Structures are given as structure tokens and as C-alpha cells.
Amino acid sequence: MIEVLLVTICFTVFPYQGSSIILESGNVNDYEVVYPQKVPALPKGGVQNPQPETKYEDTMQYEFHVNGEPVVLHLERNKGLFSEDYTETHYAPDGREITTSPPVQDHCYYHGYIQNEADSSAAISACDGLKGHFKHRGETYFIEPLKLSNSESHAIYKDEHVEKEDEIPKICGVTQTTSESDEPIEKISQLTNTPEQDRYLQVKKYIELYVVVDNRMYRNYNSNRDAINERVYEMVNTLNVMYRPLNFFIALIGLEIWSNQDEINIEPEVAVTLRSFGEWRNTTLLPRKRNDNAQLLTGIDFNGATVGLAYVGTLCRPTQSVAVIQDHSKRTSMVASTMAHELGHNLGINHDSASCNCNAGPCIMSATISNQPLSEFSSCSVQEHQRYLLRVRPQCILNKPLSTDIVTPPVCGNYFVERGEECDCGSPQDCQDACCNAATCKLQHDCDSGECCEQCKFKKAGAECRAAKDDCDLPESCTGQSAECPTDSFQRNGHPCQNNQGYCYNGKCPIMTNQCIALKGPGVNVSPDECFTLKQNDPECGFCRIENGTKIPCAEKDKMCGKLLCQEGNATCICFPTTDDPDYGMVEPGTKCGDGKVCINRQCVDVQTAY
């Protein structure tokens, strides 16, 4: 029996108060020096399947002192960092595309926490010494190896002691999108979700992320693909820590380096680059590599102080589930924070208003990118994110990677169901699952969990496992052959819903009033029909689509299918500003625009012929 090895390292600490040193993060004015000394710890319970010897342990612990106090940093390998079909792509000098599937099972990127501290977290690379950050007593500390010959010394320091690379505030290029005032947010927070909505929000969600590095950034790192790979791995590892509070798990499914030349025109005008990258994802990337979201890291200096841009509320869309980020700092944590910010826009989160705040430090969705990395989501962002998920329900985030898709050597007894295992309830001493054989990680009977599993056996065929949640949903029943409830199914498109106020469309009942509430908060209604007539030729509120930058007015019959108009108090004809997201503030597809008619492609057509 091979047991999981826990490693404890003791650090001798020598504070260097007031001294200065140049590290990878830049010039650090105050730091402590520690010398790791590896000490084997007592074996931990758990049964490990036979496997080849690995360079890095799955679980490690480090003991050291911070400000003279001993702490224990617990680390676990980020098992979800790479998807099984993770690939790396670069280009030969003659332009040939070269794609490989490198072995990433034995990687060196970890998440963790300080022992006995509930609010702690860590993201660490252990590839060549210890590099990353950890949160201790509400403060963030950074650690990295000191490049001294014949020495295992490391530096520990705070962000406040790192000299800023420049004093110019960095900004996001998304404009005219700000979280609503406190009043709507408070009203929303007081609303009670249905049990089905609560279940949906609590389900783990997954994003398979594809990262592209442009030619400028490649050359900025001396055309060293290994250096870029390590930098991107660190960024995505950190990105995961930031998104765990939202119950999102991000797996890197591909990394592409434009080593020969850029595959699109990358311009200083960030909106142009974003549009080109979205088109490239749709026409070139998706046909050869599946992904839920793609981000472009570029070495170009965007116009002004802008360092990133993304579409808002567009996750899973072929041309718009994208973001572009300037590699604006030597510090991976700073760029990772910008990646988190732009991904937040894709997830329907707008910029925080002045009334939004975070428990500690800056907020991720502040319009100004903070000089302090590793920020967190505000309560405003959480509310907006949940509202977006419940309104749009993007499907690509629910396809959890199979147990074979998350790459790691299988360990029976570590509570993770991995390749070759049917269940994993911990060690035989700890297992509380009567359906699982802890010694073999095999099921005793049919199943151990799932909506269609009862007392370790499949429920009989026909047993309802998911009730219809509304007029546009259908109930699901167990098949008798699986522990999982069948995939959610919906009423046919065009089925009347909500007392004939609308027609079902892709499992939802799109009604203009609900769309107004989603954008403005409770107490808002759709404008009267005369508003749509009055605003028909208004350049801001009366168009149906934008072609080559020109707003095309709606035809008379289609006036209810263009810009959404809402009523709030005495304001009867409110429309929403045009943003980089072409669908923001527009009437949703499938919305009822008359008796027996629905909006499709911004046109009001007969429901019988629409689907």
C-alpha cells in the first residue's frame, strides 16, 4: 500500500526591514527571507492506487513564520486546472499549425489555505521553489524564490511593498455598464428564489477556457514558449481561486501561441481587436477546438489607459464569449485580476457603482483596474451574476467535464472520483457511504448518489426526478437504468405561456415586462405600445439592428422587436444605452410582439412559421 505523502517544510525567517530587492514582481522595498527545509510528516490515511512515481505530490503542507508567528500552509494540487483533451498550439516559420497534447498530469500548480483559518486561500506554483500568494489574517502575502546560487531562500512580502510599475490608473474598455444603485440591489436580495432556482445557483459550473497569446507577447518573452506556458498556467490557477466563491471551476482546455505572426489584425483600438478575435473564434477556432470561452492575451498597448475589453452577458455565444487583455504587468496576479474582470463581463456582471464594496481590498468589477491584485467580487456583482444566470441560463457551463476529463493520477481514498473509480468516499476509516466500497472505490450495487438513486439502487422507470418548473418546462422521470435524472427537456417553441402573455422559446417564456425587470430591477414595466410608435425613428431607441456601425430603423411591423422600452414611475419610454454588446437592451428573441406573433431575427413573424 502506497500512502499519500504529506511534506512539511520549516522556514527560518530573517526579516529585512527597510531593505530593497528586485524580484520577478518588481522592486520590493520590504520583505522577509525564509529558507525551506523539507521534513517528512506522518503519513495521512488513504489508499493510493499503484501508479508511476511522480515529481510533485498531490498534497503538501508547509510550516513557516509570518511576522514571527508560525503558520501551516496546506496545499492540494489543482486537479481541475487542465481538461483531458488539453492541447497546445504554435506555428512554424512557414505558417504550419503545430498542435500537441503534452503530458500535464504531473503538474505543479496548487490551491490551498492556512490551517485553522476559515477565510484563507492560496494559489502556489511549486515548479521551481514556491511562487504565488496566500491570504493570512485578512492580508495577502506573496512568496517567490530568491535567485541566489546554492541557496533555497525565498522572499515573503506584501503587495503594498512592491513599487508600482506606473501611476496611471488602468481601466476596462466596457462603457455605460454600471451596477444599479443600492435600492434595486436591496430589493432583489429580498426576493425569494424558488427551490428550483436555488438548486440551479448551487450547482457547480464549469468553464473550459482557451487562451491565445499574440505575437507581440510571444516576442516580449524572448520567443520562449515554456516561459509563456508557465505564466499562463499561473494566471489560470489564480483565476480559479477568484471564481470559487461564485461556484465556478475553470479548466484550461487549450493554449495557443501565435509564434509566427498574428492570425488576426491586432489594433490599438481595443474594440476592433475584440471584434476580430470574436470572429476568429467563431470561424477558425471552434471548428477545430471546443471551448466555452476564449481570451486573447496581447503585448500591444491599447489606446489610452485601457487594458481589457469583453462583451457583457455573452457566455457560450460563438462570436461573443471572448475577451481581450493587455499583458500590462510583469506580475501574473495583476494580469490574472484583469482576466477575472473581463470574464465577469461575459458572465453578465457590470461595473460596480460607488455604493458597491468588498469585504477586503478592491473589487474585481471596479471600472478602474486596481493596482492591488487578487481582489474579490462585491455583493453587487454576486447579485448581478445570479440574476444573469437565472435569466439567461447559459448551457455550456453545465456540461461538467467527465471524470476522465480532469487529468490526475487516480488515488482511491481522496474523495475525488477519478479514472477507473466508480466512487470515492475517503479512507476505509473515514468512509460514511454505505453504497461505496472504500477499499476498492467500487460501488456495492448500482449507485451511490443521484436523483434516481435510492438505497444504492436505481429508482424504477417512471419515477419523477425533476418537476416542471414553469409553463415552458417538462417533467423528467427516471429511466431505471441510471442514477442521473435525464437531461432537462422543454416545451416546444411557440407553446403559450404565462396566461398567454408569451410563447415558449428554448425553455423560457420571454416577456417584455420581465426583461425590463431584469435590466432595471423590481417595479418596472414594459412601456405602452404608443411608446414604440413614438420612438420608431429615434436614433437611440428606435432601431432594430446595427450594420457596419449604422443603426437600421425598424419597419412598422417590427417596431416591437427592436430596442426594449420600459416604464418606471413617470418615465414611460425608457430605453437602454448602446454598448459593445449588440444584444444589450434589445427585445429578446422569441418575445411575443402581437397575437400569434413572435420576434425572430428582429422581425415580428407568425408563431406558426417561426419555428
Curated annotation (Swiss-Prot):
GO MF term set: metal ion binding; metalloendopeptidase activity; toxin activity
Residues at which Zn(2+) binds: 341, 345, 351
Single Gene Ontology BP annotation: proteolysis
List of residues binding Ca(2+) 3: 473-474, 476, 488
Cell location: Secreted
EC number assigned by the record: 3.4.24.-
Peptidase M12B domain residues: 205-401
Keywords recorded for this protein, A-Z: Calcium, Disulfide bond, Glycoprotein, Hemostasis impairing toxin, Hydrolase, Metal-binding, Metalloprotease, Protease, Secreted, Signal, Toxin, Zinc, Zymogen
Propeptide: 21-191
Tissue occurrence: Expressed by the venom gland.
Chain span(s) of sequence motif D/ECD-tripeptide: 471-473
SUPFAM superfamilies: Blood coagulation inhibitor (disintegrin) (SSF57552), Metalloproteases ('zincins'), catalytic domain (SSF55486)
Binding site for Ca(2+) 2: 414, 416, 418, 421, 424
Gene3D superfamilies: Collagenase (Catalytic Domain) (3.40.390.10), Disintegrin domain (4.10.70.10)
Note describing how the cofactor binds: Binds 1 zinc ion per subunit.
Annotated glycan sites: 282, 548, 570
Enzyme class: hydrolase
UniProt: Ca(2+) 1 binding residues: 208, 292, 396, 399
Required co-factors: Zn(2+)
Function: Snake venom zinc metalloproteinase that may impair hemostasis in the prey.
The protein, known as: Zinc metalloproteinase-disintegrin-like MTP9
High-level lineage: Eukaryota, Metazoa, Chordata, Craniata, Vertebrata
